[in-house]
């Protein structure tokens, strides 16, 4: 988001000139602060108690760690870290897993994320779907009238249409190999000549404009990890293994996946995986950071909004 930033590793209890620091190189922060923090968390977290998805579990630690490894181009480590998740068990079996049903994929956003109570029992997992790894919990006592039940009116609850899907995304849905994508009907709502994000909507836009509900927001889920792992394996030259992971996701969406022979270069495979992430994870805050991480933000954004100068990508 910011690139190089000032580094503080001790609390600041009062004002002094010492709070003004020069920026520290982002790679130093990743290597010497973020990754050591994650490895410490990995060693300390209770793997037999922390199952709740609105708190960090060991799989949540690994999800962040794998994400960091992808940013630092340590693809073997990202691949190995994601593999670890399959071994974590709770009383209900695997803690995280792939959800093969498109109907359940839909209801996990519209029902599973809605109206979960706050509690202090990390060993109690309220979620029936294992897709979610970590999410931000919403409590009605804390947020009040948020209008969050429909993402397009999130900011005011009065129909500001804050999450309108772009024409670029809609053109992806219209590509030949995306015809019949079962996710489209659950992702897009044509409303007042615009394409609204309906991923988190259980009903229709017009029947409850100011409805407020307690909806958690997914930060990491297992399909996100599988597609990251596909990208890592593609970077390692394992194209078939990468596409096998993509196939699981596209099978659920009712789509066909090509074989490795259909691609002429690693970059083609990577772009194919990134497009799948764009569609699968729409509304989950992933696309922009995928473009930054892979260095593709200029080629993608310049035709859309003219972004092309180094520094434009940072706040």
Task: List each model region and its residues.
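Short, cationic low-complexity segments
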Residues: 154-183
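Acidic/polar-rich alpha-helix caps and helix-coil junctions
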Residues: 1-146, 176-315
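Active-site-adjacent substrate-recognition loops and nearby beta-strands
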Residues: 146-155
